[in-house]
């Protein structure tokens, strides 16, 4: 055959040149291009290679042939007939090559099963018993044959044989018991023998990849919220709660498994146990809200100053504001004293001013602090006839803490005993120096009764406001502060909001602390409804979900859903903090109460008209508690007294106190029927004094001892009927019968008892005065000696009061 190119040979054998080049390369022929010629020798070499490779593949595929045969027959035994299905299988194996025959002298030949099955078939026709043995033999033969076909691992071999040897017994049992149910047996055998069984070696290999014990301690990054229970902290560190409690005991803190701990304490515990703490801020939602609102953009315009009038009680703060507003607020206040924060927007001839009137009573410290917090200028009212008082000094401290300027108004200069110079001297001791003395505080003598000096005071206020250059953005979402809040029976929660920037409109979504809502109505300080309020404008807002806490910041939120989420988050956070405080206080009191006597407690259900008054009353009443008696306010709230309040008082044996609120008709009927102690007050002085009297009645009685007389023993008489009788001379006071006595020997008390008998000249007498002789019999005491002294005293109960 003539030489031809690789391409021509590929066309001849009907294959691609590339495939032919690959086969030449596998055959060891050094041809790399399709245009190269291929010789006859190289063709034979390629042909030999192809034959060898194809024969190996076909040998592998056809080295084993299995023929299966199935035969059905019926065996009759009397009236019964049994269907017998006999399956046979024959395997043909191709002989191995000559080289293997030389190395392996005796190849293994499988025993054909056809003859066995034929014999079984013949025997099955004879009787049923022989057929049963034949089926058993066939099953055993197949069971022996099955493991020999599988590849066995030396390590797992014995275990496999044990399992296989057990399996035919179960099948034999089925064959013996259910011989007449051949089809059912086959179906069950098929279910027990799935077509594809997972290899035990691979399964064991998977099982070997189990838990690996760490060689070094696992250090975890523990995410810590602002408060967390001990159980949750232990779960985050994957340790038992007892380990965490033990670690905290080493740090000096006694905790329980359900107790909440703060973030800092949890971080210390995590570091102590070898992990890394990661502090999480839970107020991300609020921060995102503030970032969304951002700084209010727009042109800042001048606004009216917010002026807070502060000073001691009865120094004329509200009277001064009355004269400025040309109204009579003082006459409507209970007792003539202010007990709420009043916000008023006043138009004067000189300009607009917003006044905040704060209480002067010592119980309203929080109100005064709130007034100083949201103000621009503080007007300190001092009575010229009274001088500087404790609440005056407190007002100065609030103004300094808020870093606001102070204008001093010396009131009541119309009185003859007024001394303004003394006021300046007293205030100078508190670093409040007038301008004429080189200080920076403006002083203005005024009279709220006659109106003297009030115009000059307003000029000074506006002058101070010009110096401060007060400006605010008058458009955009409003921001403000809740000055006061209350619960109105007809209108629901009402909050007095002082707008600090932006403009508040009807329908805005307002978020105030833990409460939110849509502004349904706005009422100005003059009692008229309004539709909008700008900077420095106080308005009453209706529509909040609950009574807000005075002093909270009010923000207009564009999305009601976002406002609801933030309010609920704050409520949950407040609840957690309150429970943590209560639990901490409870744990701290456990050891304090050990060894102490029972502490008398006065339970009170307190209801007030506004949030600020409720806060002040709660603080004032809690301050009345002492080591012996305690005020326990079991419930408090804003609004009228309801039946639930009375039922709570009945259950806890409490007194119901209403401050400027009343009970409705059904509640009064319940109070009369159950006999609950219900008290109304409108002046804080009266309320505190009444609670003091009630606490004084709970105090344990205190007794004073007063020595009535002293007798000296001159002689001792013995009597078989009465015992020892001391003949005495009364040297001091009066000796009375049935009073307690003390027997003194060498001025040391040796006995305390009762004076049983008192005689003079064998006559019983009630008392013996000084300088008179008498006979004294001491009850249950006979060891009286000459020279002893008998001291007679009496106990008197002292009325105790709460300081």
UniProtKB/Swiss-Prot annotation:
It is found in: Cytoplasm. Residues 311-318 are annotated as: G1. Residues 411-414 are annotated as: G4. Residues 111-121 have a biased composition (Polar residues). The keyword GTP-binding applies. Residues 336-340 are annotated as: G2. Keywords: Cytoplasm, GTP-binding, Initiation factor, Nucleotide-binding, Protein biosynthesis. Residues 138-155, 168-178 have a biased composition (Basic and acidic residues). Residues 95-125, 138-178 are annotated as: Disordered. Pfam families: EF-G_D2 (PF22042), GTP_EFTU (PF00009), IF-2 (PF11987), IF2_N (PF04760). InterPro entries: DNA-bd_dom_put_sf, EF-G-like_DII, IF2_II, IF2_N, P-loop_NTPase, Small_GTP-bd, T_Tr_GTP-bd_dom, TF_IF2_bacterial-like. Residues 302-471 form the tr-type G domain. GTP binds at residues 311-318, 357-361, 411-414. Residues 357-360 are annotated as: G3. Residues 447-449 are annotated as: G5. Belongs to the TRAFAC class translation factor GTPase superfamily. Classic translation factor GTPase family. IF-2 subfamily. One of the essential components for the initiation of protein synthesis. Protects formylmethionyl-tRNA from spontaneous hydrolysis and promotes its binding to the 30S ribosomal subunits. Also involved in the hydrolysis of GTP during the formation of the 70S ribosomal complex. This is Translation initiation factor IF-2. It comes from Coxiella burnetii (strain RSA 331 / Henzerling II).
